[in-house]
């Protein structure tokens, strides 16, 4: 496999999880460019449908020839997108605009909704103050991280949208609550590093992964997570959660595999379902280990599935652990204490 092919192969792998990995290879590494390419960009002959225009100090979107499906415009100075910018590439599937100077007012008309084959749209590290749109129904992966977003438009009708990354913005709960209505395919939602003080209503029950860490959340409504029958990964670390703000069965969700409550103000270990495998509670104010937080009943077939448990940065010492702890945590590989 040529090095240029390997580069795109890595990007394709990164795309399968909804993540985008930034490989900063110089343009010369891609080899000879295909003739069907903007002169200032590079289109590897082995992957002529990909056009790389990274780090060229571009101030506008270059001419994109027909046949391009993967367009990379990272690390430029692009501050506007004209409505006809992608007129020749209606079959564009990936559009990567990370690290530019884009503002909402300078993204014209229905420039994205015209791209009926678009699956990935990444506009991370720009100057957006609200979500972009309208968007095509084909979209699967939307990334708008590291902007200044305070307002979300509705994503209703985006039936294929599976991944949404909104971390490192300025969102509050009122801006979030109505935005995700009707997203029946949404599996991954990252709202970390925002200004959310209450858990937003109206989140899709289809979610497998929900990240709300590094916000200002202090309480959890009773049975809030009960309706999320598919939820597997939940992060609420670096919030303001205390015992008084967590009803008894808040995290008794049978589908949960991983729960992160680290860096909060908890004095007692919240009760979890026996199916939970990874539980992160480091740097709280925990004073005791209550086995009933993990096992309601102990028996040959009644035990916790916990594999990794972090309790470091608390007031629990090894000598204070109950003698029957490992009868409950019998499959644990790692229990981290101070």
From Swiss-Prot:
This protein's UniProt keywords: Disulfide bond, Extracellular matrix, Glycoprotein, Leucine-rich repeat, Phosphoprotein, Proteoglycan, Pyrrolidone carboxylic acid, Repeat, Secreted, Signal, Sulfation
Residue list for modification Phosphoserine: 304
Modified sites of kind Pyrrolidone carboxylic acid: 19
Tissue: Cornea and other tissues.
SUPFAM superfamilies: L domain-like
Family matches, as SMART domains: LRR_BAC (SM00364), LRR_SD22 (SM00365), LRR_TYP (SM00369), LRRNT (SM00013)
Entry comment on modification after translation: Sulfated on tyrosine residue(s). Contains keratan sulfate.
Sulfotyrosine modified-residue sites: 20-21, 23, 30
UniProt keyword annotation of Mitochondrion present: no
Disulfide topology: 295-328
GO MF entries: collagen binding; extracellular matrix structural constituent; extracellular matrix structural constituent conferring compression resistance
LRR repeats: 67-88, 91-114, 117-137, 138-159, 160-181, 185-205, 206-227, 230-253, 255-276, 277-296, 305-326
LRRNT domain span: 28-66
Family statement drawn from the similarity comment of this UniProt entry: Belongs to the small leucine-rich proteoglycan (SLRP) family. SLRP class II subfamily.
Protein name, per record: Lumican
Name of the gene: LUM
